[in-house]
């Protein structure tokens, strides 16, 4: 039997469009089984943690973020804020809230990746066992640092926390739709991948790294 070009193109189009839909359906279906994480990991020894927080002109939010975060630290832990090309008083506020602060001024090399690299070089002077990257505008739920640290140390690989966006009611329907799409992308799909035994993407905040991975 032969297949004409039009039919072949039709099957190719269906496969191209249908495959992502099938993958998404599978991820959502498997995610419905819930979180199958093991609580045994939490019984492991608590590693020494450094929370690395890049911050560019975050004076409006950084104090609130640090007040929620610092009580979660254990003895030997620390928070390092990289005040990156700031034109406000981010550094002063972070220092008064109890964080260690380093200032970075380099207007040719801008961006989060440069700030993180700068912070890692500073941490290397007294290397922690686990580095957790948290953005300055994130709300860190109670207990999150401890769980991330233990998971990362036990598995000796990067670990991503649940990272959600909360849309103010004033944003109306478009904001609520965006928040729902964010939940599917950052919660449902990664949970499905986890239950299937696959890795999920790292999202740039709420991410823990073993020091052995960071230093390379």
Listing of model-derived features with the role each one plays in the protein:
Residues 67-76:
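Short, acidic, metal-binding catalytic loop of nucleotide-sugar glycosyltransferases
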Residues 63, 89, 135-151:
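Acidic donor-binding/catalytic loop of UDP-sugar-dependent glycosyltransferases
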């Amino acid at each position: 039997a032969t297949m004409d070009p039009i039919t072949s193109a039709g099957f190719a189009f269906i496969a191209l469009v249908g495959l992502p839909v099938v993958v998404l359906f599978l991820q959502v279906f498997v995610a419905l089984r819930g979180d199958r994480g093991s609580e045994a990991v939490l019984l492991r020894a608590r590693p020494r943690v450094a929370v690395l927080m890049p911050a560019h002109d975050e004076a409006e939010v950084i104090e609130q973020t640090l007040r929620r975060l610092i009580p979660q630290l254990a003895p030997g832990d620390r928070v390092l804020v990289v005040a990156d090309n700031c034109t406000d008083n981010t550094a002063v506020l972070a220092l008064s809230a109890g964080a260690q602060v380093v200032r970075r001024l380099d207007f040719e090399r801008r961006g989060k990746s440069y700030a993180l690299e700068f912070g890692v070089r500073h941490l290397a002077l007294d290397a922690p066992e686990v580095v957790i990257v948290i953005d300055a505008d994130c709300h860190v739920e109670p207990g999150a640092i401890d769980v991330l640290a233990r998971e990362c140390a036990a598995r000796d690989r990067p670990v991503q926390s649940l990272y959600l966006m909360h849309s103010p009611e004033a944003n109306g329907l478009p904001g609520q739709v965006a928040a729902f799409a964010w939940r599917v992308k950052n919660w449902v799909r990664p949970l499905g991948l986890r239950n299937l035994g696959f890795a999920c993407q790292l999202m740039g905040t709420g991410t823990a790294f073993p020091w052995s991975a960071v230093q390379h």
